[in-house]
Amino acid sequence: VNTIVSGSPAIAAVAAMLIVLLVGDFASTFFYHVPQHVWGKLHLRTHHDRRRSYWDHAVLSRDPAVLLDGVLGAVPYLVIAALCAKLSLGGALLGLALGQLHVWWRHTTELGWTTPAWFVRIARGLQIVLPEDHDGHHRNPEIEFGDIFRFYDAPARTLIVTLRAWTPKRKRVPVRRTVALKRRAAVKPTS
């Protein structure tokens, strides 16, 4: 790649930016986000807590656990950006900036944001995660994986199922969850 783009700083910058976004999202999804959903508690406790506003939580919070979750999710992007800085420092920094802007944007549904239909069509074509998609992930942590790109969702779900099947402790969790739901349904509220 470097020999192709070495003659053009603009092409090098675009290449570095795209690598940071695509490879960073892949690494963050499969090396942090998916393992947290299978084995971890930090991400589930901080990012999927229904008692909290996820706009305040993801964007404004100063809670150390929330910040740690955010930093750990960003580490793959930072590593890729450091490697891409040799190709184009400006492109690597632009990739990080666009990634951070996307973090803020994808948490705006709670503020009343609705993505315009024309932009939905463009984003769907580019497989970009919309705020409405990410809102679905907050409401149901089993769907809509991929920080920036939707094409990581299906492989992430497949990997989660595989890892849960290989984890002996986790095999009983769906059974316990089903039993608990049946108990709740069987207990009728009294007025």
Where are these regions (language model features)?
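Short, strongly hydrophobic alpha-helical membrane anchors
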Residues: 1-11
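Membrane-embedded catalytic scaffold of the fatty acid hydroxylase/desaturase
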Residues: 18-172
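Primarily interfacial, aromatic-capped hydrophobic alpha-helices that serve as membrane anchors
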Residues: 164-191
